[in-house]
């Protein structure tokens, strides 16, 4: 059995179709849909995952994403609630992805508008939110690379990083990519 069939067996064709149709529940971080998406992400080729998430980043409404990551909007702070170095991990991955993209303020994080601190271990949730918003709006490929790395290395952080709407977009894109690839592979 090939990788695609292994993934289909683990996730289930019905779950993939549910993701593709945008009918998954990403409201609750512990939902079965969230766990299935994390499993799919862990099994994907990192480059394919990065490409799909970069395309998804371009579809995320910038205001909706900003509202998700900005501390205090809607009385939430999803990045600030992360424990065990999760915030610093997201900050380091984002900054590294932007530096690798190598253009504009991304290669010089101190030039990101409003950013107070560029040391990932000392950044607060507001600083990480500024970097995330900047990456999502200005460098979607770097944002996709960061999301892929976070999703594969620390999948539990992905919901706080992306938010439910972006998770739903990513799940639909990943399922569509997987279903398309499955149709191309020999049975």
Each PLM stretch: what is its role?
Residues 1-187:
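Amphipathic alpha-helical interaction segments
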């Amino acid at each position: 059995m090939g990788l695609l069939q292994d993934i289909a067996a683990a996730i289930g064709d019905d779950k993939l179709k549910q993701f593709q149709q945008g009918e998954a529940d990403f409201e609750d971080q512990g939902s079965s849909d969230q766990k299935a998406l994390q499993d799919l992400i862990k099994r994907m080729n990192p480059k394919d995952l990065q490409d799909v998430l970069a395309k998804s980043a371009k579809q995320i409404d910038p205001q909706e994403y900003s509202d998700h990551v900005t501390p205090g909007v809607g009385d939430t702070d999803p990045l600030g609630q992360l424990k065990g170095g999760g915030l610093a991990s997201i900050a380091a991955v984002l900054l590294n992805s932007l530096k690798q993209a190598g253009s504009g303020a991304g290669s010089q994080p101190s030039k990101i508008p409003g950013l107070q601190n560029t040391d990932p271990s000392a950044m607060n949730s507001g600083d990480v939110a500024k970097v995330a918003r900047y990456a999502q709006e200005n460098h979607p490929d770097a944002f996709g690379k960061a999301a892929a790395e976070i999703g594969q290395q620390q999948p539990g952080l992905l919901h706080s990083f992306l938010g439910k709407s972006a998770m739903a977009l990513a799940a639909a894109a990943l399922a569509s990519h997987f279903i398309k690839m499955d149709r191309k592979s020999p049975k």
